[in-house]
Amino acid sequence: LFDTPPDLDIVRNIYSSIQNVIAVGDPRQTTYSTHHSQKYKKYSEGKVRNFFCEHLGELCEIDEITLSKSHRNEQIVCAISSQLFPELTPSVSCECCDDSHIEHLGAFYVPESKHLKYLEQYNPIQLRWDSRNSKVNPKFIAMNIGSSKGLTLDRVLLYPTKNMIDWLNDENTQLVQQTQSKFYVGLTRAKYSLGILVADNELSKLRQIIPIYE
Protein backbone atom coordinates (compact mmCIF):
# COMPACT_ATOMS: atom_id res chain seq x y z
CA LEU A 1 0.00 0.00 0.00
CA PHE A 2 1.56 3.25 -1.15
CA ASP A 3 -0.28 6.41 -0.12
CA THR A 4 2.19 8.87 1.42
CA PRO A 5 4.86 11.13 -0.16
CA PRO A 6 7.74 8.99 1.19
CA ASP A 7 6.03 5.96 -0.37
CA LEU A 8 6.12 7.59 -3.80
CA ASP A 9 9.80 8.36 -3.33
CA ILE A 10 10.32 4.68 -2.52
CA VAL A 11 8.43 3.69 -5.67
CA ARG A 12 10.65 5.94 -7.76
CA ASN A 13 13.79 4.46 -6.17
CA ILE A 14 12.55 0.92 -6.77
CA TYR A 15 11.91 1.57 -10.45
CA SER A 16 15.29 3.26 -10.77
CA SER A 17 17.22 0.35 -9.25
CA ILE A 18 15.31 -2.82 -10.20
CA GLN A 19 14.86 -3.92 -13.79
CA ASN A 20 11.55 -5.78 -13.63
CA VAL A 21 8.83 -4.27 -11.43
CA ILE A 22 5.07 -4.74 -11.65
CA ALA A 23 2.81 -2.40 -9.67
CA VAL A 24 -0.96 -2.89 -9.59
CA GLY A 25 -3.56 -0.42 -8.43
CA ASP A 26 -7.03 1.01 -9.02
CA PRO A 27 -7.22 4.81 -8.73
CA ARG A 28 -11.02 4.61 -8.75
CA GLN A 29 -11.02 3.15 -5.23
CA THR A 30 -9.22 5.95 -3.38
CA THR A 31 -11.82 6.14 -0.60
CA TYR A 32 -9.66 7.76 2.07
CA SER A 33 -6.29 9.39 2.66
CA THR A 34 -3.95 8.96 5.63
CA HIS A 35 -1.87 12.06 4.94
CA HIS A 36 -2.23 15.70 3.97
CA SER A 37 1.32 16.57 2.95
CA GLN A 38 1.95 19.24 0.32
CA LYS A 39 4.61 17.13 -1.38
CA TYR A 40 3.09 15.27 -4.31
CA LYS A 41 -0.28 16.76 -3.38
CA LYS A 42 -1.26 16.91 -7.03
CA TYR A 43 -1.11 13.10 -7.15
CA SER A 44 -3.61 12.63 -4.32
CA GLU A 45 -7.30 11.82 -4.75
CA GLY A 46 -6.67 8.97 -7.17
CA LYS A 47 -4.26 10.81 -9.47
CA VAL A 48 -1.31 8.47 -8.84
CA ARG A 49 -1.33 7.52 -12.55
CA ASN A 50 -0.03 11.01 -13.28
CA PHE A 51 2.92 10.37 -10.95
CA PHE A 52 3.98 7.36 -13.00
CA CYS A 53 3.56 9.29 -16.26
CA GLU A 54 5.50 12.35 -15.11
CA HIS A 55 8.25 10.76 -13.02
CA LEU A 56 8.64 7.24 -14.36
CA GLY A 57 7.58 7.59 -17.98
CA GLU A 58 10.94 6.38 -19.32
CA LEU A 59 11.16 3.49 -16.86
CA CYS A 60 7.73 1.91 -17.15
CA GLU A 61 4.66 1.57 -19.30
CA ILE A 62 1.08 1.78 -18.06
CA ASP A 63 -1.15 -1.14 -19.04
CA GLU A 64 -4.86 -0.44 -18.58
CA ILE A 65 -6.09 -3.43 -20.59
CA THR A 66 -4.71 -6.65 -19.06
CA LEU A 67 -6.61 -6.32 -15.77
CA SER A 68 -9.68 -4.55 -17.14
CA LYS A 69 -11.86 -7.67 -16.92
CA SER A 70 -13.86 -8.18 -13.74
CA HIS A 71 -14.21 -11.67 -12.29
CA ARG A 72 -16.72 -10.32 -9.76
CA ASN A 73 -19.29 -8.08 -11.39
CA GLU A 74 -22.07 -8.61 -13.88
CA GLN A 75 -21.64 -6.64 -17.12
CA ILE A 76 -24.35 -4.10 -16.26
CA VAL A 77 -22.51 -3.26 -13.03
CA CYS A 78 -19.25 -2.85 -14.95
CA ALA A 79 -20.97 -0.54 -17.42
CA ILE A 80 -22.60 1.69 -14.80
CA SER A 81 -19.59 1.93 -12.51
CA SER A 82 -17.27 2.71 -15.43
CA GLN A 83 -19.40 5.76 -16.25
CA LEU A 84 -18.17 7.31 -12.99
CA PHE A 85 -14.65 7.51 -14.45
CA PRO A 86 -15.08 8.09 -18.19
CA GLU A 87 -11.42 9.09 -18.52
CA LEU A 88 -10.28 5.60 -17.51
CA THR A 89 -10.49 2.35 -19.47
CA PRO A 90 -13.90 0.81 -18.69
CA SER A 91 -14.04 -2.55 -16.99
CA VAL A 92 -15.93 -5.45 -18.56
CA SER A 93 -17.25 -8.67 -17.09
CA CYS A 94 -15.06 -11.69 -17.75
CA GLU A 95 -16.25 -14.56 -19.93
CA CYS A 96 -14.91 -17.33 -17.71
CA CYS A 97 -17.42 -17.00 -14.85
CA ASP A 98 -20.83 -18.38 -15.81
CA ASP A 99 -23.46 -17.32 -13.28
CA SER A 100 -26.44 -17.94 -15.56
CA HIS A 101 -27.77 -20.59 -13.18
CA ILE A 102 -28.09 -18.01 -10.40
CA GLU A 103 -31.45 -16.31 -9.82
CA HIS A 104 -31.69 -12.50 -9.77
CA LEU A 105 -28.53 -11.34 -11.53
CA GLY A 106 -27.54 -7.77 -12.31
CA ALA A 107 -28.51 -4.38 -10.92
CA PHE A 108 -31.91 -3.07 -9.86
CA TYR A 109 -33.55 0.03 -8.47
CA VAL A 110 -35.34 -1.02 -5.29
CA PRO A 111 -38.33 1.18 -4.36
CA GLU A 112 -38.46 2.09 -0.68
CA SER A 113 -41.95 0.59 -0.57
CA LYS A 114 -40.36 -2.80 -1.44
CA HIS A 115 -37.41 -2.34 0.93
CA LEU A 116 -38.26 -5.04 3.48
CA LYS A 117 -39.48 -7.46 0.81
CA TYR A 118 -36.15 -7.19 -1.00
CA LEU A 119 -34.15 -7.76 2.18
CA GLU A 120 -36.21 -10.80 3.11
CA GLN A 121 -36.11 -12.30 -0.37
CA TYR A 122 -32.39 -11.92 -1.13
CA ASN A 123 -30.70 -11.15 2.20
CA PRO A 124 -28.19 -8.69 0.71
CA ILE A 125 -25.46 -6.96 2.69
CA GLN A 126 -26.57 -3.37 3.28
CA LEU A 127 -23.94 -0.80 2.28
CA ARG A 128 -24.31 2.71 3.66
CA TRP A 129 -22.19 5.87 3.78
CA ASP A 130 -21.98 5.72 7.58
CA SER A 131 -23.88 4.53 10.65
CA ARG A 132 -26.09 7.63 10.73
CA ASN A 133 -28.21 6.28 7.87
CA SER A 134 -31.65 5.75 9.40
CA LYS A 135 -33.00 3.68 6.50
CA VAL A 136 -30.78 0.68 7.26
CA ASN A 137 -32.70 -2.27 8.67
CA PRO A 138 -30.95 -3.41 11.88
CA LYS A 139 -32.23 -6.96 11.44
CA PHE A 140 -29.95 -7.48 8.45
CA ILE A 141 -26.17 -7.17 8.12
CA ALA A 142 -24.92 -3.68 7.31
CA MET A 143 -21.53 -2.09 6.83
CA ASN A 144 -20.05 1.20 5.72
CA ILE A 145 -19.05 1.48 2.08
CA GLY A 146 -15.47 2.33 3.00
CA SER A 147 -15.16 -0.82 5.11
CA SER A 148 -16.35 -2.99 2.23
CA LYS A 149 -13.44 -2.02 -0.03
CA GLY A 150 -11.68 -5.15 -1.28
CA LEU A 151 -14.56 -7.46 -0.40
CA THR A 152 -16.64 -9.62 -2.72
CA LEU A 153 -20.24 -9.93 -1.52
CA ASP A 154 -22.85 -12.17 -3.13
CA ARG A 155 -25.62 -9.58 -2.95
CA VAL A 156 -25.68 -5.91 -1.99
CA LEU A 157 -28.32 -3.32 -1.21
CA LEU A 158 -26.76 0.12 -1.59
CA TYR A 159 -28.12 3.13 0.28
CA PRO A 160 -27.07 6.01 -2.00
CA THR A 161 -26.50 9.56 -0.79
CA LYS A 162 -28.37 12.46 -2.37
CA ASN A 163 -25.39 13.23 -4.59
CA MET A 164 -25.31 9.64 -5.79
CA ILE A 165 -29.02 9.83 -6.62
CA ASP A 166 -28.35 13.05 -8.54
CA TRP A 167 -25.71 11.21 -10.59
CA LEU A 168 -28.13 8.37 -11.32
CA ASN A 169 -30.44 11.05 -12.66
CA ASP A 170 -27.73 12.82 -14.67
CA GLU A 171 -24.32 11.26 -15.30
CA ASN A 172 -22.85 14.74 -15.83
CA THR A 173 -23.40 15.54 -12.16
CA GLN A 174 -20.07 16.49 -10.61
CA LEU A 175 -19.16 14.42 -7.55
CA VAL A 176 -16.38 15.24 -5.11
CA GLN A 177 -13.59 12.69 -5.27
CA GLN A 178 -14.45 10.81 -2.07
CA THR A 179 -18.11 10.45 -3.05
CA GLN A 180 -17.10 9.34 -6.55
CA SER A 181 -14.73 6.67 -5.22
CA LYS A 182 -17.05 5.40 -2.48
CA PHE A 183 -19.90 5.23 -4.97
CA TYR A 184 -17.68 3.14 -7.24
CA VAL A 185 -16.76 0.81 -4.38
CA GLY A 186 -20.40 0.46 -3.33
CA LEU A 187 -21.51 -0.35 -6.86
CA THR A 188 -18.84 -2.98 -7.44
CA ARG A 189 -18.94 -5.18 -4.33
CA ALA A 190 -21.68 -7.53 -5.52
CA LYS A 191 -20.99 -10.74 -7.43
CA TYR A 192 -24.60 -11.59 -8.25
CA SER A 193 -26.98 -8.71 -7.59
CA LEU A 194 -26.84 -5.04 -6.72
CA GLY A 195 -29.93 -3.29 -5.40
CA ILE A 196 -30.01 0.50 -5.13
CA LEU A 197 -32.63 1.82 -2.72
CA VAL A 198 -34.61 4.74 -4.14
CA ALA A 199 -37.62 6.68 -2.87
CA ASP A 200 -40.70 5.74 -4.90
CA ASN A 201 -41.28 9.33 -6.02
CA GLU A 202 -37.70 9.57 -7.32
CA LEU A 203 -37.82 6.51 -9.58
CA SER A 204 -39.29 8.27 -12.60
CA LYS A 205 -36.51 10.90 -12.50
CA LEU A 206 -33.65 8.42 -12.77
CA ARG A 207 -31.94 7.25 -15.94
CA GLN A 208 -33.58 3.97 -16.93
CA ILE A 209 -30.30 2.10 -17.12
CA ILE A 210 -31.42 -0.76 -14.87
CA PRO A 211 -34.81 -2.35 -14.17
CA ILE A 212 -36.98 -1.62 -11.15
CA TYR A 213 -37.43 -4.45 -8.66
CA GLU A 214 -41.06 -5.49 -8.42
Language-model features and meaning:
Residues 1-185, 189-214:
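Conserved helicase motor core of SF1/SF2 NTP-dependent helicases
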